[in-house]
Amino acid sequence: MSRRSSRLQAKQHAQPNQPDSPQETQIIQAKKRKTAQDVKKRKEEITKKHQYEIRNCWPPVLSGGISPCIIIETPHKEIGTSDFSRFTNYRFKNLFINPSPLPDLSWACSQEVWQNMLQKENRYVHDKHFQVLHSDLEPQMRSILLDWLLEVCEVYTLHRETFYLAQDFFDRFMLTQKDVNKNMLQLIGITSLFIASKLEEIYAPKLQEFAYVTDGACSEVDILKMELNILKALKWELCPVTVISWLNLFLQVDAVKDVPKVLLPQYSQETFIQIAQLLDLCILAIDSLEFQYRILAAAALCHFTSIEVVKKASGLEWDDISECVDWMVPFVSVVKSVSPVKLKTFKKIPMEDRHNIQTHTNYLALLNEVNYVNIYRKGGQLSPVCNGGIMTPPKSTEKPPGKH
């Protein structure tokens, strides 16, 4: 037996149980009454607080400035659930209700890979309204800059993914800044491409080459300083799932038949570059930032295939992409009105990888055509492009009889 137990037993034998004295009983009862009164008093105070609200004591005319307030007594109000239906942009999105369209993978869980991609899509935010933050900029300035970056990518045989990473870095960086001078756009753009090339390219161009293509507008020191600014502003979040990555994935999911070959492109390179050209043109328009990259890629795929293919490859329904599909109609009309883009061959680039090299065409002229189509659409008319391409006279064999 422990020493403590021995002491307790000895104490109990030395002091036998005795009934409480009347004085001690009165003290205990008084304490109980006091405690009950305190609890009741606190409840009354809480109830009283709920019966008061703050009301502006000045007329509505003066409510624009700082207004004194008074506290008035009001009837008790039940706290009701607010209507959150108007806060659509801030609702929690349950990513787990989207089943993975990916096939079974030998190297990872397809559902986990899919959920990770969706989480990235929601974490890397872009917004077409970033131009509101920059009073000195106009929408076409972004288009001109991105068109120039496309040309630089083609000259240095950079991959499409490199361009789309640079585009994402630029748009997200501009969303973190305010009142950027238009003279800084080229520096921000070329620095974004510099960062993207180091991430994506095996043999990235040297720093002096990026400075060279700016024709003296940006020095190597300027690019290095801006690189650090961009990385800090983006908090080193440099791994978005780009538009072109989604397109690659969707075409692969639709075409793959054999699981062991899932990592090798199984789709048509010609189909890929046709859709990629459409996305190149779309991304020049600042309104494209209104849509998630996954939606843009799925809408472009829908224009060249069918909604059934989109459902199979992306897991998206028509309601998810219908708005983007409609927005993309003028772009599709313009792209299909010109000669189809052809696969190019590049030195030191394997044939199986040539479709991934970024190419450039006169995108600014095509974008002007898109603007024309939009003007006609708003006026309720169909432009010549929307009517099926550029209008040309019929062949002599197709003319009506008697009009030769």
Swiss-Prot record:
Q: Which PANTHER family does this chain map to?
A: CYCLINS
Q: How is this protein annotated for GO cellular component? A: cyclin E2-CDK2 complex; nucleus
At what positions is N6-lactoyllysine found? K348
Origin organism is Mus musculus
Q: How is it modified after translation?
A: Phosphorylation by CDK2 triggers its release from CDK2 and degradation via the ubiquitin proteasome pathway. Lactylated at Lys-348. Delactylated by SIRT3.
Biological processes per GO annotation: cell division; chromosome organization involved in meiotic cell cycle; DNA replication initiation; homologous chromosome pairing at meiosis; regulation of cell cycle; regulation of protein localization; telomere maintenance
Q: Where is the composition biased (Polar residues)?
A: 7-28
Q: Where in the cell is it found?
A: Nucleus
| Name of the protein | G1/S-specific cyclin-E2
Q: Report keywords, A-Z.
A: Cell cycle, Cell division, Cyclin, Nucleus, Phosphoprotein
Molecular-function GO term, any one: cyclin-dependent protein serine/threonine kinase regulator activity
State the Pfam families in the record.
Cyclin_C (PF02984), Cyclin_N (PF00134)
Q: Which residues carry this modification: Phosphothreonine?
A: T392
Residue numbers bearing the Phosphoserine modification: S21, S383
Job of this protein: Essential for the control of the cell cycle at the late G1 and early S phase.
Name the major location: nucleus
Q: Return the similarity comment.
A: Belongs to the cyclin family. Cyclin E subfamily.
Region labeled Disordered — which residues?
1-41
Asked if the Swiss-Prot or TrEMBL record annotates the protein with the keyword Aminoacyl-tRNA synthetase, the reply is: no
SUPFAM superfamilies membership: Cyclin-like (SSF47954)
Assembly: Interacts with the CDK2 (in vivo) and CDK3 (in vitro) protein kinases to form a serine/threonine kinase holoenzyme complex. The cyclin subunit imparts substrate specificity to the complex.
Expressing tissues? Highest levels in adult testis, thymus and brain. Lower levels in placenta, spleen and colon.
